[in-house]
Amino acid sequence: MSLAYYPGCTLKTKAKNLEDPAIASMEVLGSRLEEIPRWNCCGAVYSLADDDLIHQVAPVRNLIRVKEQGKNEVVTLCSFCLNTLKRANLLMKEDAEKRGTLNSFMDEEIDYGGEVEVVHLLEVLKDQVGWEALAQKVKLPLRGLRVAPYYGCTLLRPREVAVDDVEKPTILQELLEALGATPVDFPEFAECCGSYQIVSSPDDIPKYAWHILNSALSHGAEALVLTCPLCDYNLGQGQKELMKKHDEFDGVPLFYFTQLLALALGLGPQVCHFELNYGEPELLLREKNLLPRGEAL
């Protein structure tokens, strides 16, 4: 089965450890992530200004690319891309005036009215693959690995584009259980990582990181699993600064959900690119006998 796939910019530069494991894992699960042609940046942040329709052109054009392929669904991995594409799609579905203005402006494109559904790969795993079927494919159960699911902002907010229940999401926990790991709930599962304050107020990022990471550790987690490259960067860079200032803080391994998926499916560290991760996750994996000692990353 072929799934229309929108990668977004970061997965082609700084987040190969999010994309490569996903592509390989879906092949094992019987699906192919087929990159849509001529895609462009999603726009990164959804614009809320009524008089700023030009910022909707980028995400809508990507949805048009999917429609041109005859597909009615597009899969994303990056939660920021998901959020922006979903909100632009809702605009095109629900606001006839703005839909007309945008279609008129993009007069060289086919008309678009929200025909494509935007889904996250987590939703594909849950609703199309199924947790039971996924568990049956696991070759290396992640037993003994205690992982805190970190959702961040954009997977769950605003409510109309959330991939799960906003107050009590379980989709990441269910994935971890299917892979044999132990999910560890903690109160800061949806707290903001600081987002683009890394640009405007970089000194604040370690404070966000400490609040989130320390909470996860205090609830018994050994690592975090996440979906967003910006969350990964902020928590990773934040903990680097924390380790400089606090000798007792050793850092927290950060995993993308696709890496744990690929590892459990038996695809090996070469697919997972653990060398690109923050928090030296390979040390934890070796301790749990999930990565052979001396295995090249």
Per-range role (PLM):
Residues M1-L297:
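Iron-sulfur cluster-binding electron-transfer modules in prokaryotic oxidoreductases
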